[in-house]
């Protein structure tokens, strides 16, 4: 009996701390992403490729906005990852922040993409790309649109 109660408690705990039902976790995993964080207010998943790494974070809150995500990248996340914030620009669809840093393989470039509007109320996206190549703004705009199309397809 104790084992059954323990199992139910653990199972309910797992379900109560999961991403909202409107996020298609199965599709995220089928598309080759690894889910790194899945709790009541945050879902983070990543994908490593030879030429680019992608880290996506979804924040589930009614108190967020794109300006807060941009400010957090500049003041918290870029320094935390030893990246130097250099510039930002905006497209019709997103704000794109640029940074760079050094790792064991040389210089890396980080690009933080924050959509201007959310697909679903209370779900804010942040897409972070890491690559060894500096990308021109036009290419970054195309990459941002492609990434946002894919990520937003996971939101029902």
PLM regions with names:
Residues 38-42, 53-55, 103-113, 122-124:
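Short, surface-exposed coil-to-beta transition loops
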Residues 18-45, 82, 146-147, 151:
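N-terminal "mature-domain start" segment
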Residues 4-16:
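Sec-dependent N-terminal signal peptides
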Residues 30-33, 127-156:
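Surface-exposed amphipathic alpha-helical segments
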Residues 79-119:
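Signature of long, low-cysteine stretches enriched in small and polar/charged residues
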Residues 66, 70-74, 141-148:
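Extracytoplasmic/secreted envelope proteins and their assembly/folding machinery
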Residues 41-49, 93-99:
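Generic recognition of long tandem-repeat/solenoid scaffolds
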Residues 46-72, 123-130:
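A short acidic-to-branched-hydrophobic micro-motif
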